[in-house]
Amino acid sequence: DLIGDGVGTSQVYGILDILEETIMNSCPDQNIRKSFWNEVISKLLEVEQHLSPSQLLVIKKFRKTLEWPDQKEIKAEAETSDIKDFFEKLKIKTLAIYSLTESASKQASEIIKEMIPNIKITVNKDKVGTNPLKSLAKNADIFVIATSSAKHAATTFIQNNRPKDKMTIFAAGRGYSSILRVIEEQCV
Protein backbone atom coordinates (compact mmCIF):
# COMPACT_ATOMS: atom_id res chain seq x y z
CA ASP A 1 0.00 0.00 0.00
CA LEU A 2 1.83 3.07 -1.29
CA ILE A 3 -0.31 5.71 0.38
CA GLY A 4 -1.28 4.11 3.71
CA ASP A 5 -4.40 4.82 5.70
CA GLY A 6 -4.25 8.58 5.44
CA VAL A 7 -2.62 11.37 3.51
CA GLY A 8 -0.95 14.37 5.08
CA THR A 9 -0.97 17.65 3.20
CA SER A 10 2.84 17.66 3.03
CA GLN A 11 2.65 14.48 0.92
CA VAL A 12 0.16 15.74 -1.65
CA TYR A 13 2.56 17.05 -4.29
CA GLY A 14 4.68 13.89 -4.09
CA ILE A 15 1.55 11.79 -4.55
CA LEU A 16 0.48 13.93 -7.50
CA ASP A 17 3.94 13.43 -9.06
CA ILE A 18 3.58 9.64 -8.69
CA LEU A 19 0.06 9.75 -10.12
CA GLU A 20 1.34 11.75 -13.09
CA GLU A 21 4.14 9.22 -13.70
CA THR A 22 1.57 6.40 -13.82
CA ILE A 23 -0.31 8.32 -16.49
CA MET A 24 2.81 9.03 -18.58
CA ASN A 25 4.13 5.47 -18.51
CA SER A 26 2.68 2.18 -19.69
CA CYS A 27 1.36 -0.45 -17.30
CA PRO A 28 1.00 -4.22 -17.82
CA ASP A 29 -2.29 -4.37 -15.89
CA GLN A 30 -4.71 -1.53 -16.59
CA ASN A 31 -7.16 -2.72 -13.89
CA ILE A 32 -4.52 -2.44 -11.16
CA ARG A 33 -3.59 1.02 -12.40
CA LYS A 34 -7.23 2.19 -12.41
CA SER A 35 -7.70 0.79 -8.92
CA PHE A 36 -4.61 2.70 -7.78
CA TRP A 37 -5.88 5.93 -9.36
CA ASN A 38 -9.25 5.60 -7.63
CA GLU A 39 -7.58 4.90 -4.28
CA VAL A 40 -5.30 7.92 -4.66
CA ILE A 41 -8.10 10.33 -5.54
CA SER A 42 -10.36 9.11 -2.74
CA LYS A 43 -7.52 9.61 -0.21
CA LEU A 44 -6.76 13.08 -1.55
CA LEU A 45 -10.41 14.09 -1.36
CA GLU A 46 -10.37 13.24 2.36
CA VAL A 47 -8.10 16.27 2.90
CA GLU A 48 -9.65 18.43 0.17
CA GLN A 49 -10.39 21.36 2.48
CA HIS A 50 -6.65 21.62 3.23
CA LEU A 51 -5.41 21.50 -0.36
CA SER A 52 -4.01 24.50 -2.19
CA PRO A 53 -5.72 25.99 -5.25
CA SER A 54 -3.25 24.48 -7.68
CA GLN A 55 -3.50 21.06 -6.02
CA LEU A 56 -7.28 21.17 -6.39
CA LEU A 57 -6.98 22.17 -10.03
CA VAL A 58 -4.45 19.37 -10.69
CA ILE A 59 -6.83 16.81 -9.16
CA LYS A 60 -9.70 18.22 -11.18
CA LYS A 61 -7.59 17.90 -14.35
CA PHE A 62 -6.60 14.32 -13.49
CA ARG A 63 -10.23 13.39 -12.98
CA LYS A 64 -11.18 14.91 -16.33
CA THR A 65 -8.24 13.33 -18.17
CA LEU A 66 -8.94 9.91 -16.72
CA GLU A 67 -12.71 10.31 -17.14
CA TRP A 68 -13.48 9.64 -13.51
CA PRO A 69 -17.08 10.25 -12.50
CA ASP A 70 -17.57 13.29 -10.30
CA GLN A 71 -18.71 11.40 -7.22
CA LYS A 72 -17.85 14.45 -5.20
CA GLU A 73 -17.53 17.81 -6.91
CA ILE A 74 -14.15 19.42 -6.41
CA LYS A 75 -14.26 23.13 -5.65
CA ALA A 76 -13.48 24.37 -9.15
CA GLU A 77 -13.47 27.96 -7.97
CA ALA A 78 -10.59 27.32 -5.60
CA GLU A 79 -9.36 30.40 -3.81
CA THR A 80 -6.44 31.62 -5.86
CA SER A 81 -6.04 35.07 -4.32
CA ASP A 82 -2.55 34.39 -2.87
CA ILE A 83 -1.22 33.45 -6.29
CA LYS A 84 -3.01 36.31 -8.09
CA ASP A 85 -1.87 38.80 -5.44
CA PHE A 86 1.74 37.62 -5.75
CA PHE A 87 1.73 38.04 -9.53
CA GLU A 88 0.01 41.44 -9.34
CA LYS A 89 2.25 42.73 -6.53
CA LEU A 90 5.39 41.89 -8.48
CA LYS A 91 3.82 43.09 -11.73
CA ILE A 92 4.40 39.68 -13.30
CA LYS A 93 2.94 39.59 -16.78
CA THR A 94 5.03 36.89 -18.48
CA LEU A 95 5.99 33.39 -17.45
CA ALA A 96 8.32 31.00 -19.27
CA ILE A 97 8.40 27.25 -18.74
CA TYR A 98 11.31 25.14 -19.95
CA SER A 99 10.75 21.39 -20.09
CA LEU A 100 11.42 18.63 -22.59
CA THR A 101 8.13 17.07 -21.47
CA GLU A 102 5.90 19.18 -23.70
CA SER A 103 2.64 17.77 -22.32
CA ALA A 104 3.65 18.82 -18.79
CA SER A 105 4.40 22.39 -19.91
CA LYS A 106 1.11 22.59 -21.76
CA GLN A 107 -0.94 21.25 -18.87
CA ALA A 108 0.81 23.50 -16.34
CA SER A 109 0.09 26.46 -18.64
CA GLU A 110 -3.61 25.58 -18.80
CA ILE A 111 -3.92 25.41 -15.01
CA ILE A 112 -1.97 28.65 -14.48
CA LYS A 113 -4.19 30.40 -17.05
CA GLU A 114 -7.21 29.16 -15.12
CA MET A 115 -5.84 30.88 -12.00
CA ILE A 116 -4.37 33.98 -13.72
CA PRO A 117 -6.19 34.53 -17.03
CA ASN A 118 -4.21 37.61 -18.13
CA ILE A 119 -0.72 36.13 -17.86
CA LYS A 120 1.28 35.42 -21.01
CA ILE A 121 2.90 31.98 -20.85
CA THR A 122 5.54 30.73 -23.27
CA VAL A 123 6.89 27.20 -23.20
CA ASN A 124 10.15 26.00 -24.68
CA LYS A 125 11.77 22.60 -25.21
CA ASP A 126 14.94 23.47 -27.14
CA LYS A 127 17.80 21.13 -26.26
CA VAL A 128 20.51 23.76 -26.74
CA GLY A 129 20.79 27.54 -26.66
CA THR A 130 18.76 29.14 -29.47
CA ASN A 131 17.72 32.71 -30.26
CA PRO A 132 14.09 32.09 -29.15
CA LEU A 133 15.33 30.57 -25.87
CA LYS A 134 17.71 33.51 -25.34
CA SER A 135 14.92 36.02 -25.92
CA LEU A 136 12.67 34.14 -23.52
CA ALA A 137 15.42 33.98 -20.88
CA LYS A 138 16.02 37.73 -21.13
CA ASN A 139 12.39 38.84 -21.16
CA ALA A 140 10.22 36.54 -19.04
CA ASP A 141 9.33 37.93 -15.62
CA ILE A 142 9.53 34.42 -14.13
CA PHE A 143 11.29 31.46 -15.71
CA VAL A 144 10.49 27.94 -14.51
CA ILE A 145 12.92 25.16 -15.42
CA ALA A 146 11.78 21.55 -14.93
CA THR A 147 15.20 20.16 -14.07
CA SER A 148 14.25 16.47 -14.34
CA SER A 149 13.18 17.10 -17.91
CA ALA A 150 15.88 19.46 -19.13
CA LYS A 151 19.12 19.38 -21.05
CA HIS A 152 22.11 20.67 -19.12
CA ALA A 153 23.26 22.81 -22.06
CA ALA A 154 19.89 24.58 -22.30
CA THR A 155 19.60 25.02 -18.53
CA THR A 156 23.03 26.64 -18.33
CA PHE A 157 22.20 28.80 -21.36
CA ILE A 158 19.00 30.02 -19.70
CA GLN A 159 20.81 30.84 -16.45
CA ASN A 160 23.59 32.69 -18.29
CA ASN A 161 21.04 34.84 -20.13
CA ARG A 162 18.71 35.65 -17.22
CA PRO A 163 18.91 39.21 -15.88
CA LYS A 164 19.77 39.28 -12.16
CA ASP A 165 16.53 41.10 -11.33
CA LYS A 166 14.33 38.39 -12.90
CA MET A 167 13.18 35.31 -11.01
CA THR A 168 14.32 31.84 -12.11
CA ILE A 169 12.85 28.87 -10.26
CA PHE A 170 13.55 25.17 -10.57
CA ALA A 171 10.92 22.43 -10.50
CA ALA A 172 12.37 19.18 -9.16
CA GLY A 173 10.09 16.84 -11.11
CA ARG A 174 9.26 16.56 -14.77
CA GLY A 175 5.48 16.73 -14.56
CA TYR A 176 3.06 19.62 -14.44
CA SER A 177 2.32 19.21 -10.73
CA SER A 178 6.02 19.90 -10.00
CA ILE A 179 5.91 23.04 -12.14
CA LEU A 180 2.81 24.26 -10.31
CA ARG A 181 4.29 23.38 -6.93
CA VAL A 182 7.42 25.50 -7.41
CA ILE A 183 5.35 28.49 -8.57
CA GLU A 184 2.99 28.13 -5.64
CA GLU A 185 5.90 27.91 -3.18
CA GLN A 186 7.08 31.32 -4.41
CA CYS A 187 3.63 32.81 -3.89
CA VAL A 188 2.91 31.85 -0.30
Name these PLM-found stretches.
Residues 163-188:
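Ser/Thr/Gly-rich flexible loops in soluble cytosolic domains mediating phosphotransfer, phosphorylation
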Residues 109-113, 155-162:
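Short, aromatic/basic amphipathic alpha-helical patches
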Residues 137-138:
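A short, aliphatic-rich alpha-helical micro-motif
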Residues 75-121, 125, 131-133:
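Redox- and metal-dependent alpha/beta enzyme cores, enriched for Fe-S-associated oxidoreductases
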Residues 151-153:
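Short glycine-rich, flexible loops that bind phosphorylated cofactors or substrates
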Residues 1-90:
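Electropositive, gly/pro-rich neighborhoods at or near active sites that engage anionic ligands
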Residues 147:
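Glycine-rich, N-terminal phosphate-binding loop of Rossmann-like dinucleotide-binding domains
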